[in-house]
Amino acid sequence: MNILEVRNLNKTYKDFQLKHVNRTIPKGYIMGFVGQNGAGKTSTINLINHICKCDSGSIKIDGISYADDPVRYKESIAYVGDECYFTKGLKVKNVKQTLKEFYPTFDSEKFDSLIEKYNLPINKNIINFSRGMKVKLMFATVFSRDAKLLILDEATNGLDPVVREELMGELQKYIEKGERSILFSTHMLSDLEEIADYITFIDNGRIILQKPKDEMLEEYMIIKGDYGNLTEQQKKYLIGVENKNYGFEALIESNNAQNFDGQFVFEKPNVSQIMLHTIKEGRM
């Protein structure tokens, strides 16, 4: 069963449009959501969070739409963004009390355990927390709830490597029982390389590609060499050619590598390279 099902989603804004967005996340998986600034990532997330309504289409979390059961739908989602969403003046102990009142599934003991693990002071004003401390607090709140879908929107931006690595481990634990899933929107594509199971590319309001990460990485290769050594036929296989000091670099489909000889160097790509070359080619 899928935790998230988005079907034919459309939304028109003043100068932007989400068009026929479709995506699913199976239970127990992490989906990376990537695209350039303004591609439609946050707009899509706002619709899933029901911050605004779609013009047409449907969204279901664990089989439930907002129209079916608004309370259950909202309780099924946990969200961490790039800004701390706690009101100025609050302390950790205030956050705990508020969450107990709002979420029936909130686990106070787990929250206390995470606050201790993250070494967060319970009586210090949150406004005086560092960026890393605020992010840890937000993660402590969502990890202490029984939400089916965790949405991360640039949540790991600006974190030091130690904190980021710690949180990557926590995210994998979050889904390990196979009953929860994560939608992870980030510009830190190295994070997705580490933990994502699926990758979704969005550009100009359209979902361009949604595939298992490992499958996608196998389907493409990076090719490098002297552009002058290419035949006209070989040039047709290149995706998003970039000129470098040593020659050229481009993306090709792996099954086209047989059409090149030993004058060229082939490397396995990462998610960032696939995205950048396909954008340059105009395929996204």
Question: Where are the language model's segments positioned?
Answer:
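Conserved beta-strand
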Residues: 6-9, 16-26, 33, 57
